[in-house]
């Protein structure tokens, strides 16, 4: 059973900041960040503005945080 880290956690580690610092920068509560990082909450179902604020705080794109492999959409 491999440990699956959320893209949010990987992006935060890459940015070199704590959950608290990400919370301060983004205005998203630490508890929410923790739940998203531990995959207790699905970031794909988060409000767009929350994902946007997290991405801005981490200096990355929203696509970097969303789990796009889980989203299936038809090309057409």
Features from the language model and the residues they span:
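Short coil turns linking two alpha-helices in DNA-binding domains
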Residues: 18, 29-32, 47, 61
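A short, Lys/Arg-rich alpha-helix, primarily the initiator
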Residues: 1-14
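Short, charged recognition helix plus adjacent turn
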Residues: 44, 56, 64-76
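The alpha-helix within a helix-turn-helix
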Residues: 12, 23, 55
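Short, basic-rich loop-to-helix N-cap that marks the start of a DNA-contacting helix
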Residues: 16, 40-56
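Recognition helix of helix-turn-helix/homeodomain-like DNA-binding domains
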Residues: 27-44
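Conserved hydrophobic/aromatic packing and binding residues within compact polymer-binding modules
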Residues: 8, 22-23, 33-36, 65
